[in-house]
Amino acid sequence: MRIVADENIPLLDAFFAHFGEIHRLPGRAIDRAAVANADILLVRSVTPVTRELLEGSPVRFVGTCTIGTDHLDLDGFQQAGIQWASAPGCNARGVVDYVLGSLLTLAEIEGVDLAQRTYGVVGAGQVGGRLVDVLKALGWNVLVCDPPRKSAEGGDFVSLDEILQRCDVISLHTPLSKAGASATWHLLDETRLRQLRQGAWLINASRGAVVDNTALHDVLHEREDLQAVLDVWEGEPQVNVALADLCVLGTPHIAGYSLDGRQRGTAQIYQALCAFLGQPAVIKLDDLLPKPWLAQVSLDASSDPVWALNMLCRGVYDPRRDDADFRRSLTGDTASQRLAFDALRKHYPPRREIEGLKVRLEGESGGLAQLVRALGAVLV
């Protein structure tokens, strides 16, 4: 069996070497010639897997070790009888950690009380749903916009217009889609961006084109009261440098790049491939993950929740380092910037998740226990 795989997928040999020969390539270099003799294709979000790419190839299974599927031609797969799998939720905790770290950084820069802000979460799936749980565990005011879930479940979901009108902080967690009633391409266009409240913060850690980047640049240039945090960009790996200069934090699509999340994505695709081949999944991720360097934290149960959040979050992640590395990469010509963007992702240093922490609460736990559980950490 011949496997073609993105070279940046972690634990490739550990999970897939026993299936057959692995041919590794940069994700953006996977083309028709590369898959001409492949049985299995393993990718990340940087590789568009289209009908044209796979035409004439023997590929029977496509696995993307990522949470999203907008880079996969699912209709084409169905017509060609190709099995596929993604890794829903694999990096959700890492993205939530990124958003929380960004909020703490913004609060420090702006000198504001996070508890006094109203939060709008757009998209309440694997990532957004977990973020909502954390914000509610903190006792903060949260509005949620998710039209597909509202149609399916009813509930207390609100419109995007209400989010724009009422929320001081807006965090985007939608997939990218161009068609249908819930299309998200340029969901925040110039008209909607101009509706942002005075002093609003906008965080996008979903897909770059969910926000019209040109319009966002223009609005940020005109309104100094707004703050933006962008981890994703239209036209990646090319970045709108002028827009990046106006963002309080900018990073190279690494919000979900925790060590745990990336390796979890590989494990999920391994399990899906085993199911496709009718083989037992005997390799366990827990046997491969290294021990975290910060394993346990003790907190006074009466601690202020924001202080506790800061201790737990900063213990595993601070986005300012990634922001600094990203800004250093935006020098030189366009070609150099594109290469630097991918290099930052390829050589991203190991980062663990709050979920891997064990937390001991001294005294009556009360509401702090709810926060720890919402963060995914383990109470001991």
Curated annotation (Swiss-Prot):
Cellular component terms (Gene Ontology): cytosol
Keywords: Cytoplasm, NAD, Oxidoreductase, Pyridoxine biosynthesis
Binding site for substrate: S45, T66, Y257
Chief location bin: cytoplasm
Cytoplasm is among the record's keywords: yes
Binding of NAD(+), residues: Q126, V127, D146, T174, A205, S206, R207, D231, G256
Assigned EC number: 1.1.1.290
Top-level division of the source organism's lineage: Bacteria
Active-site feature positions: R207, E236, H253 (proton donor)
Signal peptide segment: none
Family statement: Belongs to the D-isomer specific 2-hydroxyacid dehydrogenase family. PdxB subfamily.
Function field: Catalyzes the oxidation of erythronate-4-phosphate to 3-hydroxy-2-oxo-4-phosphonooxybutanoate.
Name the record gives this protein: Erythronate-4-phosphate dehydrogenase
